[in-house]
Amino acid sequence: MEEDVYKSLYERPFAEQVAFNLEQLHYRYTRLSEIDTTKKENQKEYLLLFDSFLALFRALFLEKGTRQYSIQKYYCEKGQDDIAKKINDYLDSKMFSWTDKTIREVLKFIADKFVCHVDPITNDDLGLANFYMSHLCNPYVDNNLKDIMETIFGLI
């Protein structure tokens, strides 16, 4: 009986939703990576798609608390705490070698200040967001969006 409840809660409908959301995230990332941002006419499309990507990434991986349902919580509920821990450890690792800012903090800063909420921003916030975004789309640096996606998908 308990096994049937477990399957109905975690393997059937929600597992399909998790798979669908991860597929959508991967699709959005793939489309994002195909946009040539050096051409001015592509920059609005890039920002539009980046917002969509980041909102979903935030919902899937950056939520904390008992009321939100992240991928990490999903793995914990399935008894695969080790995967959830690896994801969290990675997201809590340093984004840059010269500061203690984590990958989670950088992505959440952009998502919360510029995508998911309409928070008051300062010129410093805007400059920081521009720096973070230019870093994320730069193929020649560590912890860019490609590295983050490859690492996350490698863990799950």
Say what each PLM segment does:
Residues 119-120:
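Intrinsically disordered, Ser/Thr/Pro-rich regulatory regions of eukaryotic transcription factors
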Residues 105-116:
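Long, charged low-complexity segments
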